[in-house]
């Protein structure tokens, strides 16, 4: 897996780990992370196909974040994940920061990765994102949903 990923241009670091939380539990989860020393740096309701309320948390000044995702509707992919997980929250995806989402998308498509999005699209915080299927390649499946994130603040 690492052999192939080194050919994806611009992967910089783990941007965030996303955790699905059940409806009505977002604020309790935020308080739990705040008790560990995290602080909320961003909140947003993401409509469209995602249908989530998010809280983005940071500890110190590090670049690695925790993203808590609460579904807004029964059709939200996050709600479907919770349902699949027996009604419990848990790991939703791992996101990597890339310097150029379009280049990373093209490289991963050329290498045969199964991409969920047809093209990079707008994410929260003004980012550009795309998702890679957990079972993207039979011989090197990730086993978890992967998100690639380009942040305009990096430009």
Residue ranges with predicted function:
Residues 15, 50, 75, 83, ...:
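Acidic-enriched, low-complexity/disordered segments with a strong bias for Aspartate over Glutamate
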Residues 1-52:
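Long, hydrophobic N-terminal alpha-helical segment
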Residues 15, 55, 92:
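Residue-level detector of short, conserved catalytic/binding motifs and their immediate flanks
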Residues 1-10, 21-36, 40, 45, 53-58, 60, 65-69, 73-135, ...:
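Vicinal oxygen chelate
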């Amino acid at each position: 897996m690492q052999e192939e990923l080194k050919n994806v241009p611009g992967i910089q670091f783990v941007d965030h780990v996303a955790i699905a939380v059940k409806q009505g539990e977002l604020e309790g989860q935020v308080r739990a992370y705040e008790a560990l020393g995290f602080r909320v740096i961003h909140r947003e309701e993401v409509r469209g196909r995602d249908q989530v309320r998010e809280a983005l948390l940071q500890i110190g000044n590090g670049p690695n974040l925790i993203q808590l995702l609460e579904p807004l509707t029964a059709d939200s992919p996050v709600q479907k994940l919770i349902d699949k997980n027996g009604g419990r929250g848990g790991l939703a995806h791992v996101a990597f920061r890339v310097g150029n989402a379009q280049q990373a998308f093209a490289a991963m498509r050329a290498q045969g990765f199964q991409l969920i999005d047809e093209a990079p699209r707008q994410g929260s915080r003004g980012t550009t994102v795309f998702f890679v299927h957990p079972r993207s390649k039979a011989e090197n499946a990730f086993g978890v949903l992967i998100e690639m994130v380009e942040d305009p603040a990096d430009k």
